[in-house]
């Protein structure tokens, strides 16, 4: 855990990126399956 001053830790970047990707995919699939044609 050295050299983290002034930088964002890699685990934090990975966690935030993973959450964002999963969230976007979840919203996309939710809109596709729940709305089908109404969301387009």
Curated annotation (Swiss-Prot):
Entry annotated with the keyword Chloroplast: yes
GO CC list: chloroplast thylakoid membrane; photosystem II reaction center
TM ranges: 8-28
Cell location: Plastid, Chloroplast thylakoid membrane
Major location (coarse): plastid
PANTHER family the record matches: PHOTOSYSTEM II REACTION CENTER PROTEIN J
Family, per entry: Belongs to the PsbJ family.
NCBIfam families, sorted: PRK02565.1
Subunit structure: PSII is composed of 1 copy each of membrane proteins PsbA, PsbB, PsbC, PsbD, PsbE, PsbF, PsbH, PsbI, PsbJ, PsbK, PsbL, PsbM, PsbT, PsbX, PsbY, PsbZ, Psb30/Ycf12, at least 3 peripheral proteins of the oxygen-evolving complex and a large number of cofactors. It forms dimeric complexes.
Name recorded for this polypeptide: Photosystem II reaction center protein J
Organism: Angiopteris evecta
Name of encoding gene: psbJ
């Amino acid at each position: 855990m050295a050299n983290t001053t002034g930088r964002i830790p890699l685990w934090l970047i990975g966690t935030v990126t993973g959450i964002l990707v999963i969230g976007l995919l979840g919203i996309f699939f939710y809109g596709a399956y729940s709305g089908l044609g109404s969301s387009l």
